[in-house]
Amino acid sequence: MRRFKFQYKETIVTILTENEEFYKTAVKAILEARSEIEDYILHNPDFFTSYEPIECSGGEIINRMCNAAKIAGVGPMAAVAGTIAAYAVEKMIDAGAKLAVVDNGGDIVIHSDRELLVGIYPSKLAFKVPPVDYLAICTSSGKIGHSVSFGKADAATVVARDASVADALATALGNLIGDFGKKELEKTVSEFYGKYSDFVEGILVVKDELVALAGNLPSLAFAESKEDLITKG
């Protein structure tokens, strides 16, 4: 397994795969996805600025983001990182990669032939992810990162089979988290999962010392976050 770092404009990713050829495949896909998004924004500025779903008529990447936004009730840019990560992983799979993991600033898409430990930053929790054909783990935070969140969660994490939806729903979930006690947090998480259970495997929220979860999540473990393994801007 090799670990690569790549940065282009706002996109900062960590890529795990077998060799440099698959890494190059991922980089090419990331640049393709960004190009489509940037071109669409140039002609449709609302796509970039809206905090609510909007009608879109674009290519594959744009349509994925807009469909996810409609499901989650957020703006399409809430799905940008997960969508780009997913597109890169899909191209790596097409090229024959048995290990294709793209972490785009905390929005992670996994195709793996081995167990992986995926940390939930900034908490000390991690998921033990077994070998899996395709899984998205997307996290929104009201305390770190440059993405917009109107909530106060340390981490609002959504695990799903669709990365665009996982990313958009992580934003929506994070927006709901206020200065909650344990019961309020658990109630919010339970209701959110009940509303979106058709789209997600499970959800987890970390707020200060509190943790609430729902659904079918990978096993949890404690793990110290190593600064050099965290993908952030």
Swiss-Prot record:
InterPro entries in the cross-refs: ApbE-like_sf, MA1715-like, UPF0280
Coiled coil region boundaries: none
Domain of life: Archaea
Classification via SUPFAM superfamilies: ApbE-like (SSF143631)
Signal sequence segment: none
NCBIfam families cross-referenced by the UniProt entry: PRK04334.1-4
Family: Belongs to the UPF0280 family.
UniProt xrefs under HAMAP family: UPF0280
Descriptive protein name: UPF0280 protein AF_0649
Organism: Archaeoglobus fulgidus (strain ATCC 49558 / DSM 4304 / JCM 9628 / NBRC 100126 / VC-16)
Source taxonomy: Archaea, Methanobacteriati, Methanobacteriota, Archaeoglobi, Archaeoglobales
